[in-house]
Amino acid sequence: MRMTMEEMKNEAETTSMVSMPLYAVMYPVFNELERVNLSAAQTLRAAFIKAEKENPGLTQDIITKILEKKSVEVNFTESLLRMAADDVEEYMVERPEPEFQELNEKARALKQILSKIPDEINDRVRFLQTIKDIASAIKELLDTVNNVFKKYQYQNRRALEHQKKEFVKYSKSFSDTLKTYFKDGKALNVFISANRLIHQTNLILQTFKTVA
């Protein structure tokens, strides 16, 4: 049975989503290791990237097994959200024009606010302010994306338009998750949705980096 285009896109998104721990958790480890042994760090990074590409989710499995073996009780989804705000070199747009650098800055700002959710969620007043800040950051990022669209022409505009639509879709999903949270109080679902939105933010940068 052949997959539809939509099913293929969903599978691709899910596959890349499970690879989030590679850059959110392991990349900072590799960066620290580079200060001690550059060659070993580069070899290890390349090995993890290759293994993750061939077996999506492998990094998460390895980290989870290590935590289990050490009997460390940790909310992995929450921890991932706290760590996901850092810049990932592979996703940063390198073009020097102000519009592209602003794209990096707006994406960074949104990710940083989202990563604070675990610290704010139990304080209703602070969390409501955080939600307002997230809404503003989403709008600012989309405005910046639209500004780049207006100023620059792309052969692969469809890929950019698709990624923008995906980002908007996950933004709305995040908003719906928040509404549900205020009814059922399940913070984990908010963390999951926030991680997905951070991932979509990175994919916007990656798409611009690829076609720009």
Curated annotation (Swiss-Prot):
GO terms for biological process: angiogenesis; apoptotic process; Golgi reassembly; regulation of Golgi organization. Keywords: Angiogenesis, Apoptosis, Cell membrane, Cytoplasm, Golgi apparatus, Membrane. It is found in: Cytoplasm; Golgi apparatus membrane; Cell membrane. GO terms for cellular component: FAR/SIN/STRIPAK complex; Golgi membrane; plasma membrane. The keyword Translocase does not apply. It holds the Pfam family PDC10_C. InterPro entries: PDC10_dimerisation_sf (IPR046409), PDCD10 (IPR009652), PDCD10_N (IPR048288). Belongs to the PDCD10 family. This is Programmed cell death protein 10. It comes from Xenopus laevis (African clawed frog). The lineage of its organism: Eukaryota, Metazoa, Chordata, Craniata, Vertebrata. The gene is pdcd10.
